């Protein structure tokens, strides 16, 4: 069938409280529309004044998600990519900081012809132009735009005003606003309360926006009476009020929304026909594997410095869910704070009890670095499956240099500038860089794999492309010496100058990568390295169980 020439727009806003799951809602709706044969693009607008989240603390913002083209973006873009299996780009994430920067640059060039620069029209016009820009970058049927923040926040007002004007400009059949709210359950009264949702919609109405669809998060299903009440006070028909009951996993949300017929509702309001009915079989299969794994639980220790805030490692956690489903197991992450491992009274054996694999996570800064190096040593000496990502790979290199190659005090120049053995060093092109924001080696780069390695076995091919975010690299001055002692260069840049993957001879599964494989894992396409790592951890678990059984049997006799 012929596709509509007009791109349809869906704007997702949130009210009552933050962290309701606008990103998951947007990604889930996008996945449903894609399953109907529609081409979907998705973008996030963040109200903070930072240019991007690249320099923000993981404790405040969580993970920085890097795109193929090297943009440092909001972690919601990870949800978009994982759910839709579509690559995002720099154009997929916009901040108020970038908007203001553009407007000020325009003013300095004289683009406004001496006029007084104001929020309306100049800032709003720039926002509208950016919001429509993504639609021009491909032959899309639908563009979903998530607006960050909560309705009522002063920071989000320009984005909401831009949306209001766009709806007037494009027409109601070409732009739909879905408003996500909370319907809290009060245990003492044993009932759901609709008043917060009513007030949230009232705030939208005060700035000239009538939401087209309400999606109501709740602990319990919404009754027909509740939906009718919400619709009555929010100027909506009952069918425009969609219930979103809490799900066991985020991967059930597309199924819940499809059950509520939100995809059909959206298409009806946009007057858009889909090429085919929604196909959610893969989602049902995946959800079943996640909830009911056939082969039990595999516990993997993740060592990092931000473990008190798991959102800092969001893509790693999700990658384990994907790889676990592929291996018919549930991966249980046991967080291991790297600073705890530096304490003299650290009970390592207790910490490792039941662990079947160790992952040393990426990060920056000296804090906790010796703890990471210590856990690498333990994984190497005890032949525990090991996976090091970015800084984790660098820690593995340092540990091997110190404890196997006799390079006492070996380190990274990130932490010890004048170390005798700088096995990890600043990249040459980074030496003249002064600014921190957006200046690392960012984005997708090719890597050539060596055959007869765990990496090659996982990928099944020689050439791969992976995403990066780093300033420091393996120092090639020590490549020959480390290789002679059993360290394997399993992957490198096409020119051979940048070491991308290291492994160890004689170890069951020891892989360190300079890139970030977690950024390319998808719901229906788990990352090969995570699949391989979890598979080896599963084997380790089973072997330890047999060993424990045999040991117990001997002791009993």
UniProtKB/Swiss-Prot annotation:
* PROSITE patterns for the chain: GATASE_TYPE_1
Q: What class of enzyme is it?
A: ligase
Ranges for the region named Amidoligase domain are 1-272
Per UniProt, L-glutamine binds at: 59, 363, 391-394, 414, 471
List each coiled-coil range.
none
Where ATP is bound, by residue?
19-24, 76
Q: Which UniProt keywords apply?
A: ATP-binding, Glutamine amidotransferase, Ligase, Magnesium, Metal-binding, Nucleotide-binding, Pyrimidine biosynthesis
Q: How is its activity regulated?
A: Allosterically activated by GTP, when glutamine is the substrate; GTP has no effect on the reaction when ammonia is the substrate. The allosteric effector GTP functions by stabilizing the protein conformation that binds the tetrahedral intermediate(s) formed during glutamine hydrolysis. Inhibited by the product CTP, via allosteric rather than competitive inhibition.
Q: Name one GO cellular component term.
A: cytosol
- Binding positions for UTP per the UniProt entry: 18, 193-198, 229
Superkingdom is Bacteria
Catalysis performed (reactions): UTP + L-glutamine + ATP + H2O = CTP + L-glutamate + ADP + phosphate + 2 H(+); L-glutamine + H2O = L-glutamate + NH4(+); UTP + NH4(+) + ATP = CTP + ADP + phosphate + 2 H(+)
Task: Quote the Gene3D superfamilies the UniProt record gives.
Answer: 3.40.50.880, P-loop containing nucleotide triphosphate hydrolases
For molecular function, the Gene Ontology terms on record are: ATP binding; CTP synthase activity; glutaminase activity; identical protein binding; metal ion binding
Q: InterPro entries given for it?
A: Class_I_gatase-like, CTP_synthase, CTP_synthase_N, GATASE, GATase1_CTP_Synthase, P-loop_NTPase
Q: Which residues form the active site?
A: 390, 516, 518
Among Pfam families, the record links this protein to:
CTP_synth_N (PF06418), GATase (PF00117)
Pathway in which this enzyme or protein is active: Pyrimidine metabolism; CTP biosynthesis via de novo pathway; CTP from UDP: step 2/2
Residue positions annotated to bind CTP are 18, 153-155, 193-198, 229
Binding of Mg(2+), residues: 76, 146
NCBIfam families in the record, alphabetically? PRK05380.1, PyrG
Biological role: Catalyzes the ATP-dependent amination of UTP to CTP with either L-glutamine or ammonia as the source of nitrogen. Regulates intracellular CTP levels through interactions with the four ribonucleotide triphosphates.
Share what the entry says about its subunit structure, partners included.
Homotetramer.
Similarity remark: Belongs to the CTP synthase family.
Instruction: Spell out the protein name for this chain.
Output: CTP synthase
Q: Which organism is it from?
A: Chloroherpeton thalassium (strain ATCC 35110 / GB-78)
| Gene giving rise to this polypeptide | pyrG
